[in-house]
């Protein structure tokens, strides 16, 4: 499968949501599109998790800069 960037994946996910909200689809088609959306959601979530791990916050302490890990909720997984 071709690797696509986060923005492209998010756009595809938005298109899936639009189809489910607006189009009149059969139950089978709705389920297929929903499953596609779940896969896209997972790709976006995984990419965001990777990026979050790379983020550092630089804070100033006593005229020195210090890198600390990006704070995040451990409960969200």
Curated annotation (Swiss-Prot):
Which cellular component terms (GO) are annotated to the entry?
cytosol; exodeoxyribonuclease VII complex
Q: Which Gene3D superfamilies match?
A: Exonuclease VII, small subunit
Q: Name one GO biological process term.
A: DNA catabolic process
> Which GO molecular-function terms appear in the entry?
exodeoxyribonuclease VII activity
The main place the protein resides is cytoplasm
Catalytic activity, reaction form: Exonucleolytic cleavage in either 5'- to 3'- or 3'- to 5'-direction to yield nucleoside 5'-phosphates
Q: What class of enzyme is it?
A: hydrolase
Q: Does the keyword Hydrolase apply?
A: yes
Does the keyword Magnesium feature in the UniProt annotation?
A: no
Question: Where does this protein reside within or beyond the cell?
Answer: Cytoplasm
Enumerate the InterPro entries for this protein: Exonuc_VII_S (IPR003761), Exonuc_VII_ssu_sf (IPR037004)
Recorded E.C. number(s)? 3.1.11.6
Q: What keywords is this UniProt entry annotated with? A: Cytoplasm, Exonuclease, Hydrolase, Nuclease
Q: Which HAMAP family match?
A: Exonuc_7_S
How it assembles, according to the record, is: Heterooligomer composed of large and small subunits.
State the similarity comment: Belongs to the XseB family.
Summarize the protein's role: Bidirectionally degrades single-stranded DNA into large acid-insoluble oligonucleotides, which are then degraded further into small acid-soluble oligonucleotides.
The protein here is known as Exodeoxyribonuclease 7 small subunit
Origin organism is Alkaliphilus oremlandii (strain OhILAs) (Clostridium oremlandii (strain OhILAs))
């Amino acid at each position: 499968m071709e690797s696509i960037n986060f923005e492209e994946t998010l756009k595809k996910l938005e298109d899936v949501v639009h189809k489910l909200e607006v189009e009149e689809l059969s139950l089978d088609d709705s389920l297929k599109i929903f499953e596609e959306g779940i896969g896209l959601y997972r790709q976006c979530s995984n990419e965001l998790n990777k990026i979050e791990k790379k983020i550092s916050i630089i804070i100033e302490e006593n005229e020195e800069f210090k890198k600390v890990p990006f704070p995040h909720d451990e409960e969200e997984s």
